[in-house]
Amino acid sequence: MFERIKVKKLNDHIYLMDDDGEATGYLVVGDKKALVIDTMNGYENVYDVVRTLTDLPLMVVNTHGHCDHIFGNVYFDEAYMNPDDSEVAKDHMAFQEFVESCKERNLYMPPFKPIKDADVIDLGGLTLDIISLPGHTPGGICLLLKEDRILFTGDGINHELWMQLNESKMLKDLLNNLDKIMYVTKEADFILHGHAHGVDNISLITELRDGVADLIETKGEGDKDYDWFGGVDKQHPFGDGKSAICYSIDKL
């Protein structure tokens, strides 16, 4: 039915939406309303996808302001995001390809409404706590689904953490911010991140935290190059060695 977005049911109220392997969004369905976490690239109508799964009133929350997490907002009336990522989102929304695509399809980005650390979303029977995690971007957030003990992390915690971007925080700041939220390891058992195909153990956050600390201590000595569309930076392995923190030298 849909060419790009493939839906995977994780339990009776959580759905993973895989946008052609490029980004992942989620739908959490409560008793009174449903929450869309990240709307992905916007090439395909994610609203229509969601409406095949629930007819409840919808709320959209973006974990951060990057294009592969917000461009699908064009199919909704409003979305919530941490205002600290407003400039990031503004820059991405100015991408020529996106501007031209919206014009051709008569689509518009809806306004962002603010959401902040310690806010609580009540879906009816399911509650999510907003947890600030500046790092990958200045306004990144996580969402803790308390009843299922699941932490949605966007790109702030994953197996290939991008810290080489202009908007990314210094690595010492990321370490400090990770230390502030380590309490979640006692409140969640699993992680669902912004490019996942399934769940990760909550231990990923500890592995990442220790990896950042090791990177700072070693100053990246011996780290290999990391080639990406923005140039060549560095990558520091963590955890089982298959995960990496991608960073630029000026973030050390």
Regions inferred by a protein language model and the residue ranges of each:
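Conserved beta-strand hairpin/beta-sheet module of binuclear metal-dependent hydrolase folds
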Residues: 3-52, 143-158
